[in-house]
Amino acid sequence: MGGLSADGRRVRLVGAGLAALVLLAAPVALAMPRYRSQAIVQFHYDADNPLWELDRRVMACTYCHVDVGGGAPWNPFGEAIRVGFRADAEAGQKGKFPDVLYAVLKADGDADGDGFPDALEVFARTLPGDPDSRPDRPLAELQAGFAAAGGVAQYAPKAQKSSNSTP
């Protein structure tokens, strides 16, 4: 008689179960940390990539961290953000990441000391915490393009809707 033996059916069943498990686990394995996801949206890096949440090339962990896997230690840009959180807390605020990130960019700092302010590096899609990652356009040209695109204000956090606001 045709068909699979009991062992063959068992192997197929186990194989199908493993395939389903891999498919269900993939989104979790590919998920990005919340801060990185927020920064990608805030920097508009998601605009041209509908699958940005699954594409780690959109913003690597090394944007803020020394190690490719994230965690401590932080690079100079990541340290600037950490300092921003501390300053925010010392001022009695409950800093949300988008607000602290925007404050760091508005400060017009150059965390990695490469001659390009952090906000310009965000605009040019280079790494603001890595002095070896620099925009390929001259500073003046980059500044003009940045200003034409809206300057640092383009990275302002989206206004939060308040349930206490009156119409």
Describe each region flagged by the PLM.
Residues 57-68:
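The canonical Cys-X-X-Cys-His
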